[in-house]
Amino acid sequence: MSPNPSNSLDAFAGEKLAGLEASALRRRLAVTARGPEAAAERGGRSLVSFSCNDYLGLAHDPRVIAAATEALARYGAGAGASRLVTGNSPPLAALEERLARHKGKEAALVFGSGYLANLGIAPALVGAGDLILIDELGHSCLFAGAAMSRAQTVRFAHNDVAQLRALLAEHRGTARRALILTERVFSMDGDRAPLPEILALAGEYDAWTLVDDAHGLGVVEPGQRAPLEMGTLSKTLGSYGGYLCASQPVIDLLTSRARSLVYTTGLPPASAAAALKALDIVETEPERAARPLALARRFTARLGLPEAMSPIVPVLIGAAEAALALSTALEARGFLVVAIRPPTVAPGTARLRVAFSAAHDEGQVDALAEALIELAPESVRAG
């Protein structure tokens, strides 16, 4: 068969890109140089960033950098192998011990990222003949892990405990095992799961619960712990990686069965050392940990928005084009607030996702609020 130019790989990609462009959904990588104190440089502009998950500003903390530098000099730039071969460095082992203690669990397991953690956890615990119930606004990696498990996967409406109960009543009797997946703080809306009610349902229906704490660690009160507590090292802890905290038997099982741990290189020792030092700071500086939520609530009060439940505040715009235009207008005024568009959020709910950090000051927060009141009065109302 002779090649068909219209069916080439480049033609296929070009057609798909044209469709994304027409819908204002094409993504582009923008080089961004992050600095301390919420500073960022992009496109030759010096900006104040409100689009970073470094909630405590620890990525630039001299103590965290010093810990990473020391580990880099001692252990090298990379782990060099899978953790089950020779890639299980001393900083990794120390970090797992501290994470488990912080979460009140027997053990912890560190993965290469939060996404990799969730790709590995569900398939190691459930499979065909089992049931997964997942909040419809759960992160993409929760859905990816559920799909890889081959368990029956059913979505429940966001934070809808009544529907979750109904689905458990409908499906639990025919499933060997059941796993509920949710988030402590939802990454795009900044709201929180009703964990006491969810955990009570899990107990009633003999189900396990995994809580993704990627955006909650260290910046919101944890409340009741789930049997499976996973999260990332890349947000509050300012480093890179993911983890699961659970009982020792569960961690032992995942060490053998989580494919996203077994078949990939271990986390660089410097990343583990940085996260360990950051966890020290989280535990010993509670006033710093409280600051992002306080700033978020200052912002929502200023704009008359519902009180923030976390350091994440969505400013809903609607159309993707309008969200992009508002982001561009804010950048011209010195603020970096990236537009979030489908498929990350549902169609018609494009938004600015404003993320607050201990590195921000009140003046920066107030200035952003005033700019939004002027540029997007239909999306906010001055309080």
Swiss-Prot record:
InterPro entries: Aminotransferase_I/II_large, AON_synthase_class-II, PyrdxlP-dep_Trfase, PyrdxlP-dep_Trfase_major, PyrdxlP-dep_Trfase_small
Annotated binding of pyridoxal 5'-phosphate, by residue: G114, Y115, S187, D212, D213, A214, H215, T232, L233, S234, K235
Entry keyword Acyltransferase: yes
List of residues binding substrate: R27, R34, H139, T344
Residue numbers of N6-(pyridoxal phosphate)lysine PTMs: K235
Protein name: 8-amino-7-oxononanoate synthase
Class of the enzyme per the UniProt entry, highest EC level: transferase
Organism encoding this protein: Methylorubrum extorquens (strain CM4 / NCIMB 13688)
Documented EC number(s): 2.3.1.47
